Structure formats: C-alpha cells, structure tokens
Amino acid sequence: MLGIILSYVCYHFIYGTRITSREGEAYHKLEGKGVYSPLAVFPSADMDTVSQDFYYQTRDEIFAATCQIYLENQYTREQYEAETERLRNLKFSYQDQTNMLYQDEENYCSVAYVAMANWTDRYEYAITLDDSNTIIYVYLQNMDAKDIHMQSDYLPKYFQDNNAGKHQDTDP
C-alpha cells in the first residue's frame, strides 16, 4: 500500500497536474496560469464573436511545463477587419525594446501574425482565414505534435516537437 501511495506522489511530482478546459466561456476567465507569455495576439476577453471554439490545457511538469491554448473566433466582417488591423499594428515592449508582430504567409496555411516562433519551445501566433472571417489564436509551450488539440494544418511548417530537434515537414 505504501508503494502505491509513493508511486502516485512521485508520478504527480514529476508529471505535474493537468488542467484542461473546453468551454467557450473559459477563455474569458483565462488568467495565464502556467503560461510564460503575455498572450499578445489574443483578443480582449470581452470582444463579441459570431462563434467561438476554445481549448486550454496546461500541465505543470517538474522539468518543463506544457501549455496549449487554441481559440477560434468567427467574427462579422467589420469585427474581422478591426481585429486584423489590431494585429497588424500591435506593438509590445520587452526590456526597453519595442517589437511588432511579423506577418508570415509562407509557413502557415494562411496569413499569420507571429509573436513567437520556436523561442525556447514556445509559439504564439494568429492565423487569419479571410474567406470565413475567422481568426485562430494559438499559444504552444513545450508541446509534442501528437498531443496538440488543434488540426496539424494550423502548425507552422517549421514546428518542432518538444526537444525532438526534427522538423515536422513530410517532404523527403
């Protein structure tokens, strides 16, 4: 019995506790616990949308916490244009340096506004889907491709599994 209790405690000490949320309203309550980013690309929590899909999972592991946030917002045309304008003009400061998101049309399935691209195994970006007035906001931290909740099409072409050191391209 002591062995079972000890193995349970060791497992949770090493692999941490997983927190998962799938409810649309959970995005509005997101406080960024276990997230090592200001989540600059994500919209304000009070923004109205036509529809919303949200997934949040974090696991506080002993060596490297993992986190994935996926938010898909469909907007009216006017809301979509205002939100893409916000992304185009977004500036944020870090250590006396001001940066803007960069626009990437080559490495994503559509035009993306990127804040972080494989910076210490972290990715933060927003993909714009013009034909449906939809924006997909993504934050990934120390994630393996097989554990990611969203479609693999929404990953950048240069995505690397956590510490795997291999690109996920399928080209020979």
Where is each model-derived feature located?
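N-terminal export/targeting and maturation segments
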Residues: 7-81
